């Protein structure tokens, strides 16, 4: 993939993400459009790219031979969204009818911050159950498997569901972290969640768009000093700065939406990971593949979040030993 393809892809992605009109310096030919659409699939941002294409003037729309591909993408995207909504609605009804209080989290929660939530490409459904409710929820799905981090994992109608016993994927006492579901908490959660993508299966533009729109829509609705303190306590401050630097440079985030006094750093190292790995669902998700990716990125993860990286290694090792013994 050429730098020109990537830059054109990002321009269209930003237009879709922020719903802004766009005129490209030069439009791709048919082969270029095919590469861009393939990239939108591997980065899990098909809906946003379709939105971005709609922001182009008539003379820069994809050529006629690409229209069937676009229609196929639109139809597949709509079917996936409908299936996801059906599964999530049924799951939440089941849990609430059982007297539980499920909290939608991660990307599923970030969808509400998009100008058009239906433009976000669906993935897994992540649900947090508050204290005392996780075991009751687990009993509703006796055939589900238990992941190495303790989450209950099942699949319904091709949609993966994960029920989590803790809100944060952070190895710090929860009582000293922001309240689950609070604006500050959502930003901290996404910061940690995206880091786990980087060191594991891979990171795509989808998660970065989640973070960008969350920061933009939550601007002015939380205490930035409190977020800074939480990031420092969690050992995620240096990583958060790198993440925001990439969002400002490539995804159109206003620097004012970052922490007070934000000073960007060169995001090239993270940009390269995103370009090379893409969204994890388009790659092998075997334990061997994940372990290989984790080891390759160990120098990166240790340089930005050493404490969280080492804690994750310990947790995964212990979790694998426990699940192997069952």
Model-flagged regions — what are they?
Residues 1-123, 129-326:
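Conserved NTP-donor binding/palm subdomain of two-metal-ion nucleotidyltransferases/polymerases, i.e.
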């Amino acid at each position: 993939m050429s730098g020109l393809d990537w830059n054109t892809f990002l321009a269209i992605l930003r237009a879709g993400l922020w719903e802004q009109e766009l005129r490209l310096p030069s439009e791709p030919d048919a082969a270029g459009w095919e590469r861009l659409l393939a990239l939108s699939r591997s980065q899990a941002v098909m809906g946003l790219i379709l939105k971005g294409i709609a922001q182009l003037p008539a003379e820069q729309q994809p050529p006629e031979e690409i229209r069937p591909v676009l229609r196929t993408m639109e139809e597949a995207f709509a079917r996936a969204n409908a299936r996801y909504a059906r599964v999530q609605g049924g799951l939440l009804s089941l849990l609430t009818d059982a007297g539980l209080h499920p909290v939608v989290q991660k990307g599923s929660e970030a969808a509400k911050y998009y100008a058009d939530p239906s433009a976000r490409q669906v993935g897994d459904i992540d649900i947090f159950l508050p204290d005392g409710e996780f075991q009751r929820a687990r009993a509703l799905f006796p055939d589900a498997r238990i992941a190495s981090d303790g989450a209950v994992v099942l699949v319904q109608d091709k949609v993966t569901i994960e029920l989590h016993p803790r809100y944060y994927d952070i190895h710090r006492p929860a009582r000293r972290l922001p309240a689950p579901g609070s604006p500050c908490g959502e930003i901290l959660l996404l910061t940690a969640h995206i880091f786990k993508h980087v060191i594991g299966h891979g990171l795509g533009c989808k998660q970065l768009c989640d973070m960008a729109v969350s920061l933009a829509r939550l601007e002015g609705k939380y205490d930035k000093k409190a977020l800074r303190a939480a990031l420092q306590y969690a050992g995620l401050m240096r990583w958060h700065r790198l993440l925001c630097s990439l969002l400002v440079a490539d995804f159109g985030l206003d620097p004012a939406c970052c922490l007070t006094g934000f000073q960007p750093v060169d995001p090239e190292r993270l940009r390269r990971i995103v370009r090379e790995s893409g969204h994890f669902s388009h790659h092998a998700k075997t334990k061997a593949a994940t372990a290989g990716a984790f080891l390759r990125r160990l120098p990166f993860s240790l340089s930005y979040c050493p404490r969280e990286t080492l804690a994750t290694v310990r947790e995964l090792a212990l979790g694998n030993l426990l699940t192997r013994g069952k």
